[in-house]
Amino acid sequence: MTVHPPLALEAPPERLPGEPDRTRASGPTLYARLVLHALATALTGAVTAPLWPIFLASVLVWGWPPTAPAPAQIVRYLRLAVTATPPAPGLPVGVRAWIVVSVLKRAFTAPVFGLAWQLDELLYGRALDETPVVAPLFEVSAARSGSTQLARYLEEDPRLVAPSFLQASFPYLWLWRLAPATVGRFVTAEQVRHAIASRLPPEFLQRHEGDPFRTDTFEASLFMMHLNHLSPSLGPDVMIEDFSFAVIAPHNRQLWERTFVDLLDRVGRKTLRYAGPLPDGSPRRLFVKGHFLGACDAVAARFPDARFLAMARDPVARLQSAVNYIRANPIETSLGAPPWGWLGAALAENEASYCEVEQAWFSRADGPRRCVVRFADYVRDLEGTMRVVYRACFDEDAPPPTVPKTHPPRERTNYLLNRPLHLLGVDEAALSSRVRAYHEWCGA
């Protein structure tokens, strides 16, 4: 195993003048919120208790659903909440208690989300098994690489169909079919967009142009269904293991190589079935965007004719954006954001590892069909870049007319959170040295 020099500097200050207050809750505020959190969790446990016998019976028929955290992960996170010893500012008792309650609440909801998944198996299981997934396209790129914008362009190809953010978050075909005939009669798509945006902090909205009805990072829903989203609150060591998209820790192998692939497979078939064929009767092709590099071999084994597409971008710029983005992300809003130093240390290691694995995986001689486009080329020549993508992934010389050929004007944003790397606790010189080969490979 290669030992790399540390990429983290001393912990930076938690708040600078002019920054929004994202510091972790403490004192009376934390404990008041904790009491409410515990009461809500106890109520959730009481309400869902009668569902457990039905849920466990369904597990005997269809197996453990990918929408519910595995018992082993629940036990692990309860143990970590008590025993984890991250660096300063550490884990106060109130924060540990908050994490314990959050884990229990997620465990108590397992029958709800699990039975919602199993209902699809009861109603549509055979039809889904018979739904073909032919030559799917998977865009697998590092976070903050420009991959979401590229995915939105590809979505304009009517032959492709991608699960939207809402579909990935609520992956139940029966619900997709029920919603338009019920809630959809009274609530418009624009009202849904506004309702979701109003719950997100402005510093997050500045960095992520989300649309619940369009494609987004697919595995984000996996993290929220399970417990990985809590890892940043447990310190950098836990985050390095459980918030990594490239290097799979031994205890996460089942999650990524089996649970994730099953989720991807089933949601893909549901998406194809829900969308239906093209007007001429020809089938659509599945398209999924994410960062699931560590699972690519397992995905390729499930879909041998798949195409894999990556956007390669300067990792230093990506990391600076990623740390600010995660700090702004309302993962546990009432608890507050993880400390800057933890985020910088964990994401620097994960970013460097991602670069190493991505370069190796997309460069090796064997494996599935792959295509890499450089961010610099993508920005400078979108039309030429899309031609490269379509030749490699579609065996066509050019995309259809519906796919954009030029970038729309982009407004520059004065970010509310926009720290440089040295104020994120990251040693930029050490990072640049470690990713030098990748930097040359991606043409940054």
Regions found by a protein language model. Name each.
Residues T2-V112, H251-Q254, G268, L286, ...:
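PAPS-dependent sulfotransferases, especially Golgi type II membrane carbohydrate sulfotransferases
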Residues K105-A127:
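N-terminal pre-Walker A segment at the start of P-loop NTPase domains
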Residues L128-V134:
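Phosphate-binding P-loop
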Residues E139-D157:
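Glycine-rich phosphate-binding P-loop
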Residues V140-A142, F287-H291, A312-R313, F375:
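Short His-Asn-centered micro-motif
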Residues D157-L166:
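Post-Walker A helix-loop "phosphate-sensing" segment adjacent to the P-loop in P-loop NTPases
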Residues S169-L286:
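PAPS-dependent sulfation machinery
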Residues V299-N324:
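Conserved phosphate-donor/acceptor-positioning beta-strand/loop module used by diverse small-molecule
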